[in-house]
Amino acid sequence: MKKIIVVSIALMLSGCATQVDKFSYLKQWNDSWQACDRQGKTSTLTFPASPWFNALAREDKIAVLIYLNELKDYQCTEDEALRLKAVLADADITTLNDLLKGFIYFEAPDKEAIQHLDQSQVEALAKAIDGPFNPLKVAEDLGMLQP
């Protein structure tokens, strides 16, 4: 799936003539999110101790974990994503922008699933996590995979 997106984007960019080398911005972003993806898969993160998190219902813990995972993935490639977005906006390539919207490494995560929770606690957890992580490993370490 990831390769299909990158190939589609490359084809769209190569067909658009502008003074900016859009392909180099795409390549930088692509290289960055691939590195972040590898980092997350190999992460040995120990989830920060948090009495607040421990007291949450299982569904809320899952929502927080998913949000934090998506946030750290996005933050890992945020600089490259912002540069690519700026180039795409200047070139008015709306099809490519639409294709990338919602891709976790291109957009900040939606807070809807955690909006009812204490945002200062979510932010504290986010600050305590250094970078991308493996959410399945963390969920397993926290005992969240058992029904």
Give the predicted meaning of each segment.
Residues 14, 33-36, 73-78:
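Extracellular secreted precursors and ectodomains with disulfide-bonded cysteine-rich loops/domains
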Residues 95-147:
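C-terminal amphipathic alpha-helix
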